[in-house]
Amino acid sequence: KIARVIPDLPEYKGVIAISFTNKASDELKRRCKQRCADTKQSFFGTIDKFYISQIIIPFSSHVTGNITEYEIVDNIDESSKYALLLEEPFSSKKESILVEGLQEGKIFLKYTGETALYILENVPGAMQYIKARYSHIIIDEYQDCGEIQDKVFIKLVVEWINRNCCGRYKSSNIWFYKTIPKISDCSDEKR
């Protein structure tokens, strides 16, 4: 699918190709480069890598008002001021803690989806950038997406142009999205 799309794109555009592991992303990129040598401005990587490199780092300064260097925080100490993030469910209080973390240069790996969604909803330039740079988003094994990935995907679907989700057809998410005309399911296509 990706190799059919890329040749028709202008040099400044690419596709977003999301896989769930770095190994799968590397393999997908390798296969695409075999079929079309120039992948242009395409992104190949995991969903977290996409959130961090294409949404959070470039646009968090629009939320925080300052530019800082970021560290990825894998674990949250239960005694830290960020411990509320460990409680369920996600809330507006947690959202403000994520923003506070960004102000202090912290990106919480477990909450990259929530952080990216917050930025997409509050920084118009983030969605404009995604639309300007990428023509398609293709998510491999979409049935393995969690709730927050699903929300981000819906946000992109509502405001964007071309999308494909690859996964098992009978999966609940894929089945649901067959009813949305903007989404195509490539679960039956050869990869």
Where are these regions (language model features)?
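P-loop NTPase Walker
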Residues: 1-60
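Hydrophobic "anchor" residues on beta-strands that sit immediately upstream
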Residues: 42, 136-137, 164
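Active-site flanking residues adjacent to catalytic metal/cofactor-binding acidic residues
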Residues: 45, 139, 167-169
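Catalytic P-loop NTPase motifs of RecA-like helicase/translocase cores
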Residues: 50-51, 142-148, 172-174
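Conserved RecA-like helicase ATPase core segment
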Residues: 152-191
